Amino acid sequence: MLMTLLILVVSSALFLYWFRYTVILILRTRPAPDYAPQVAVANHLSFVEIRQKLHAPVETESLGSFCKALQQDYRMLKYLLGHAATGQAGRYTVEQRLLMANFRVLALCCAMVQRFQPNAAKTALLEMSSILEYFANVMGSRVAALAGEAARA
């Protein structure tokens, strides 16, 4: 019984380590053309402005509104990725699914700690905005590829 519990704990710890490391590696990859600002402006998304505000001193009361705004941006980008008129519509890659799971965990953590540990909430919000930037770049590259195909036709 003790050995089973030990194996379960160690396996869970290794899975969490792998998950975090994989998410960090995915977020560190940057595409050559950065489409995130254009996608954010075109779709009225606020993650770019929120990221800029988070790099300055922020009042604790505004963290909750930032979290809600990022969740709204997440829903919009997820909808766009799932319904874009490309060959990849409705399908998410493994990387995108990992980032979606991480976003939901970060949103939950942010909601739980924003009053008691504002710096931890700020860190979670910054990572949430990085995930949204990744999704915006994916969306922008899909649109650019589609525009390139239309120009060749």
PLM ranges: what are they?
Residues G90-A153:
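Cytosol-/stroma-facing membrane-proximal "stalk/adaptor" domains immediately downstream
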Residues M1-D34:
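N-terminal signal-anchor transmembrane alpha helix of single-pass membrane proteins
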Residues L25-Q72:
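Elongated extramembrane "stalk/tether" segments
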Residues H44-L45, K68, Q72-Y79, A107-L108, ...:
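Generic structural signal for well-ordered, non-membrane alpha-helices
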Residues H44-V58, M76-A89, V113-R115:
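Short, charged/polar, low-complexity loop and linker segments
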